[in-house]
Swiss-Prot record:
Species this protein is from: Yersinia pseudotuberculosis serotype I (strain IP32953)
Family (UniProt): Belongs to the aspartate/glutamate racemases family.
Annotated keywords: Cell shape, Cell wall biogenesis/degradation, Isomerase, Peptidoglycan synthesis
InterPro entries: Asp/Glu/hydantoin_racemase, Asp/Glu_race, Asp/Glu_racemase_AS_1, Asp/Glu_racemase_AS_2, Glu_race
Xref: PROSITE patterns: ASP_GLU_RACEMASE_1, ASP_GLU_RACEMASE_2
Catalysed reactions listed for this entry: L-glutamate = D-glutamate
The protein's name in its UniProt record: Glutamate racemase
Length: 287
């Protein structure tokens, strides 16, 4: 029997469910520069398993940690607008700390649907620390963002905050999700400023959504008993509340889908990973 030719802008395997089997669901867009936002998506899906999920990642401009704020704002607006033209969005989650620190005001000004951002979990980390030293591990853009410095000034006046910015760690997380090995020596080199301290942080804020993907490896390198905190669960609760507060939300019977900005060998290799997260199809977003 003949099979339908596959669109050049789409990568997929046999659909997990058909539209007829899927109940109507509000549509949630989860966006990140890379695949780190899948850690946030996991938390949201645990609370809201019946939403229609779209995952979009900017593999053309990745990583955002080294980009200017102006570029990031324009890029995120362009991508969210393109997704909105094809899907009735009920909510957007910017699952990228770097993008959240600069793009939320512009997104909320342009769109009527709620937009949720990810910010470093400094406040809960301050409550958890035992030695009064909290480490913020993030991209350099997030570490130096005025929003981050404001959070520290508001919630961490009684603690010592050690800042460590690393884009290399983002690349390491991407490599792991693509099936690569995480060399512990690389992590030790990245974390050396903390590991060499007489009294290192006992609580670490994972200030990039890629970093929860590396918690097992980080735990092998950091001092025993170090706590790691991220914003995933809090973002999931906020998303659930905003969804439940909406009325007359347009629902979708479409299956979950992932969008990238360019299809290549790397995205082909990533498809099985995305399918394991519940995204049977990966498609190039027309922008």
């Amino acid at each position: 029997m003949a099979t339908k030719p596959q669109d050049a802008n789409t990568t997929s395997r046999e659909a997990i469910t058909s539209k007829a089997d899927s109940p109507p669901r509000p549509t949630a867009l989860i966006f990140d520069s890379g695949v780190g936002g899948l850690s946030v998506y996991q938390e949201i899906r645990q609370l809201l398993p019946n939403l229609h999920y779209i995952y979009a990642f900017d593999n053309v401009a990745f990583p955002y940690g080294e980009k200017s704020g102006e570029f990031i704002v324009e890029r995120v607006l362009e991508i969210v607008t393109a997704v909105q033209q094809s899907h009735p969005l009920a909510i957007v989650v910017i699952a990228c700390n770097t993008a959240s620190t600069v793009s939320l005001p512009a997104l909320r000004e342009r769109f009527a649907f709620p937009v949720v951002g990810v910010v470093p979990a400094i406040k809960p980390a301050v409550r958890l620390t035992r030695n009064g030293v909290v480490g913020l591990l993030a991209t350099r853009a997030t570490v130096h963002a005025s929003y981050t410095l404001d959070l520290i000034a508001r919630f961490a006046t009684d603690c010592k905050i050690e800042l460590l910015g690393s884009s290399e760690l983002v690349e390491v997380a991407e490599t792991k999700l693509h099936g690569g090995v995480v060399p512990l020596e690389v992590l030790k080199k990245i974390l050396h400023p903390w590991l060499s301290m007489r009294e290192p942080p006992d609580t670490i804020v994972l200030g990039c959504t890629h970093f929860p993907l590396l918690t097992e490896e980080l735990a092998q390198v950091l001092p025993e008993g170090t706590r790691m905190v991220d914003s995933g669960a809090a973002i999931a609760r906020r998303t659930a509340w905003l969804i439940s507060s909406q009325e007359n939300v347009i629902s979708s019977q479409d299956e979950n889908i992932a969008y990238c900005m360019a299809l290549d060998e790397d995205t082909d290799a990533l498809l099985p990973v995305l399918q394991s997260y519940g995204f049977p199809k990966l498609q190039k977003l027309p922008i």
